[in-house]
């Protein structure tokens, strides 16, 4: 089975908790950075991570990483990513979110637009078509720039994983399920003990 490099974003400060969760599932850690943990896994790992990781916000398949300081460079290097390996001829694809920190390229809308154009050009040449119906499955792409290093991932989660839960009603200032799970994991609480939340409302 094919092995992917997977990116699991999380709340800042919870990287160690998420790393421990990933190791408990039996996967090899590639890198721990501010706000995300990268690890290796196959297609089954993608499914298991989306279901069982309680502190991850979403799971991305890493499509590529490169340095870009100009929009021309961003276009050309995005075009070099083998998009045909991930997105079929009828796939619906778009850059759903772009974030930039301490980078020369900082306009999210421009980053999204240029990357989409590069993806289209790559897939047009690979599939020998001039128009995409985009009638198939969705392949949302997320991009993050940190100090001019561009990391590109295909989102396998869709809606953020903190919305997986059973919550039927929401109060005015709810704590997300992923953050609540992390807070519990940071305590010495065990499953056989009673848990009381005095601030539950």
Language model segments and positions:
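A residue-level signal for conserved active-site and pocket-lining positions in enzyme catalytic cores
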Residues: 95, 143, 183
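C-terminal edge-of-domain segments
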Residues: 141-154
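Hydrophobic, well-ordered secondary-structure segments
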Residues: 112, 116, 120, 140, ...
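SAM-dependent Rossmann-like transferase core, predominantly class I methyltransferases
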Residues: 152-186
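Glycine-rich helix-loop-beta junction characteristic of Rossmann-like nucleotide cofactor-binding loops
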Residues: 83-87, 174, 184-192
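Conserved class I S-adenosyl-L-methionine
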Residues: 191-201
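Glycine-rich, histidine-containing beta strand-loop boundary motifs that form or position
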Residues: 34, 154-156, 199
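Non-catalytic nucleic-acid substrate-recognition regions in nucleic-acid-modifying enzymes
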Residues: 2-139
